[in-house]
A protein has these predicted regions:
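Metal-dependent phosphoester/phosphodiester hydrolase catalytic core
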Residues: 1, 6-9, 13, 17-23, ...
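Dinucleotide-binding Rossmann-like beta1-alpha1 core, especially the glycine-rich loop
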Residues: 30
Length: 343
């Protein structure tokens, strides 16, 4: 049923009776996504559901710990825990506990969550000769404990070889969701549609299943984990942090069952920091130029002359969320604007 919020008048509704349980399996979602030529927009408030066919699955609830990634370099374990957005009034402490087979859990590290709602955990003198279970724990302001469980693999240094999975240029959709229905560009082509399996890649189920079938010992993500214009156009003011986190969460959510138990190295690239090209130029800010925007002069940064378009606060937040768990750099000295390094 859809009711007018002001008058309570019934606007639309449908009732089906005698529906078999297997015919209504799945989730329930509401979306406001009109075609580009449409002008109406909607929002939803106080959404409720009920009935014998509605089941709450706590094992499918997302958050507050969204995902983890880790790397193991000789005897140093580094792990990042990506949390969902939290109030500044919520507790800060995130804990890492581990256990070997048949043993009890014991705490080995703790860290406050910081920029990007990410906690960075570190354990020196790690025993890399064995496999360890781990859980990341977070206690919220209501005293409820939440956990995210995974496996730290042993160092494969004595194995004759191992498989590396390589990813880059990951897009949640083939075409942006604001671009209409995706009519075929040539007569013999099949249209993609909008909310179809041909257009929607997220949550990358087939891709991840194929990767897992190879049992990789290392996952390397070489850049463009996100695209600023996908699945929706970039909302990029002076600091596009909120828009970035939305798109980064899609990646972290989709790949979390892979990264929770596979050592992972992540390198950021141009689209991760909302640029179409990136020549770092020692960390300098990209020079500005004046362009015409709808009849008015506007000063913008020219990425193709080298440097960064956005400020160091945003750049470092992206690197923290994506690469904060990478092995220590050879030389941690930051480049200009105090931008961190990963090499």
């Amino acid at each position: 049923l859809a009711l007018d919020g002001a008058t309570g008048e019934l606007r639309a509704g449908a009732v089906r009776r005698g529906v078999r349980e297997q015919d209504v399996s799945g989730g329930v979602a509401l979306a406001s996504s009109p075609l580009p030529e449409g002008r109406a927009r909607f929002w939803f408030r106080d959404v409720q559901s009920g009935g014998d066919k509605i089941v709450v699955r706590q094992d499918r609830v997302i958050g507050p710990i969204l995902s983890t990634m880790y790397s193991l370099n000789r005897n140093v374990l580094k792990m990042s825990a990506q949390l969902m957005p939290l109030s500044e009034r919520e507790p800060r402490t995130v804990r890492l506990e581990v256990r070997s087979v048949g043993a009890e859990w014991r705490e080995v590290a703790q860290s406050p969550w910081g920029g990007g709602y990410t906690a960075l955990l570190r354990v020196d003198n790690w025993d890399s000769s064995r496999v360890w279970d781990y859980r990341v724990r977070y206690r919220d302001s209501a005293g409820i404990d939440h956990e995210h469980i995974g496996v730290v693999q042993s160092d494969p240094k004595d194995e004759p070889g191992f498989t590396i999975a390589h990813l880059s240029c990951v897009m949640p959709t083939a075409r942006g969701l604001e671009g209409g229905t995706g009519e075929a560009e040539i007569p013999v082509a099949e249209p993609l549609g909008r909310y179809t399996s041909k257009n929607l890649h997220f949550p990358h189920t087939e891709l991840i299943g194929n990767i897992l079938s190879h049992k990789p010992r290392l996952l390397v993500c070489a850049g463009d984990q996100i695209y600023e214009g996908n699945p929706t156009s970039a909302d990029a003011p002076d600091n596009p942090t909120l828009d970035y986190l939305y798109k980064w969460y899609l990646w972290a959510w989709a790949f979390r069952d892979l990264t929770r138990s596979t050592p992972t190295i992540v390198q950021t690239d141009d689209h991760d920091i909302y640029q179409g090209n990136l020549w770092g130029n020692g960390g300098r800010a990209a020079p500005t130029e004046i362009i015409d925007v709808s009849g008015r002069a506007e000063r913008v940064r020219d990425q193709n002359r080298g440097g960064y378009v956005y400020g160091p606060e945003f750049i470092n937040l992206v690197q923290r969320t994506q690469s904060g768990h990478n092995p220590d750099p050879y030389d941690p000295t930051p480049i200009e604007q105090d931008i961190g390094v990963n090499y």
